[in-house]
Amino acid sequence: MPGFNAVPRRDYVMAALSGVLLALSFPKPGFSILAWVALVPLLLACGRKAPAVAFRLGFTAGLVAYAGILYWINIAVVTYGRLHWSVSIVIFLMLAGYLALYPAATAYVVRRGEDRGISALLAFPVVWVGLEYIRSFLLTGFPWASLGYSQYRTLPLIQIADLTGVYGLSFLIALSNVVLYRIIRGFAARERAPYPVKSAAILVLLLVATLAYGFNRLHRPEAGAPFSVALIQGNIDQSVKWDPAFQEATVAVYERLSRKACSTGPADLVVWPESAVPFYLQNEEKYASRIRNLTRELRSCTVVGSPAFERDGETIRYLNSAFLLSPWGDVVGRSDKIHLVPFGEYVPMAKFLPFVNKIVAGIGDFSPGARIASLETGKGAIGVLVCFEGIFPELARGYVRAGSRVLVNITNDAWYKRSSAPYQHLSMTVFRAVENRVPLVRAANTGITAIIDSKGHILRMTNLFEVWRPRFSWTRK
């Protein structure tokens, strides 16, 4: 059998194959089993290559993977940023190229380590997970599509997230890939490599321990007080959402759906999505009074997504916020989005990039919230994660440490239409529930609205672009 050095082009094909398998392991389509073998072709291609060659192969795999996972960015940039497709694709490839540097760096470091006697069986999972963690905060952080998130539907496996976060599962998946790679090398290489007996045994033991822990957690009964929530998915078309002419119709939709959801009696919590009201709730008295009257009528605490502002002398700070209204119609709290979307809600280093606002229409000028603030409902505190804050474990953990017993994710994924983005977004919020052992409810303008218990069960979820106003009760801690 010819060595893998014989046909360089084949090495790039194999690296690209790893990228394709990685992309397919995330929703949609979400063939999660592929994640456990997806990196084997890349590892085989790297073989005994020079570290610089391994870097290029890792970059190829990463570029293909992230291009397949994040294709939906073009939908938002072209449709709502009003950029030409050619410009959008350049921006998209720049992002995919940046993210591809992480698997490229992994391949490079692992090969250099092997040249110095450090086994890939140890180095590969450690370096992969270490770089996943760095990616979660470097350059504002973008922990999208970490390996472990591919398993969000495999509940016995993901229970370890309350101990290790998503990174524990990423480690297991990376270890599985490198063990399989070494087994194949042992069969196929000219110079027979030693079979990774110890590493394979460790992998099996870790998987058995993970599954045992998972099944144990899944069979523990929930104990606590009942809690009822009504989630409102208004399905407001993004193209008219901010048109003042549609404000009346938008408020009317949420009034109607909220009344139907609470027709059998008050809910402990009613949740409207991110920016459900397309105006400043603080000073649009005509509609604000209607919403206050509605909460009194429903006799339910209500979370309302709305932009907000704060004055500091002559300076005005704009915020992406969630207001909590009491059953008596009073605004009793506000939670401001802390982790903003770069180039969506603000321009990083705006002083050095003044041209960006001129190129891309619709970039916001929001300021980050100052602190984590749980909101008290009378039936327990809630922590509100606005939009893609749900992908950051430390934010969810901060709200739970601040006393929140339910996490609430309000979002508007209408930007991405019927792509895989809403499904990928949902998959990450499943981990926030398991990591903190609290239920998480999410209300999305056009979907996916969902109710997730503390073990990661998705108890209810919507389809995209449907009107929904479910009422659900469960036991929470």
UniProtKB/Swiss-Prot annotation:
GO cellular component: plasma membrane
Highest taxon of source: Bacteria
Keywords: Acyltransferase, Cell inner membrane, Cell membrane, Membrane, Transferase, Transmembrane, Transmembrane helix
Domain CN hydrolase, residue spans: 232-477
Active site: 274, 337, 387
Alphabetized InterPro entries for the sequence: Apolipo_AcylTrfase, C-N_Hydrolase, C-N_Hydrolase_sf, LNT_N
GO biological process: lipoprotein biosynthetic process
Molecular function as annotated in GO: N-acyltransferase activity
Keyword DNA-binding assigned: no
Subcellular compartments: Cell inner membrane
Residue ranges crossing the lipid bilayer per the database entry: 20-40, 58-78, 89-109, 118-138, 155-175, 195-215
Entry keyword annotation includes Amino-acid biosynthesis: no
Membrane topology: Multi-pass membrane protein
Pathway(s) where this gene product acts: Protein modification; lipoprotein biosynthesis (N-acyl transfer)
Enzyme category, top tier: transferase
EC id: 2.3.1.269
Location, primary (coarse class): membrane
Entries under Pfam families matching the protein: CN_hydrolase (PF00795), LNT_N (PF20154)
Disulfide bonds: none
PANTHER family, per database record: APOLIPOPROTEIN N-ACYLTRANSFERASE
Protein task: Catalyzes the phospholipid dependent N-acylation of the N-terminal cysteine of apolipoprotein, the last step in lipoprotein maturation.
Family under the similarity heading: Belongs to the CN hydrolase family. Apolipoprotein N-acyltransferase subfamily.
Protein's name according to its UniProt entry: Apolipoprotein N-acyltransferase
Lineage: Bacteria, Pseudomonadati, Thermodesulfobacteriota, Desulfuromonadia, Geobacterales
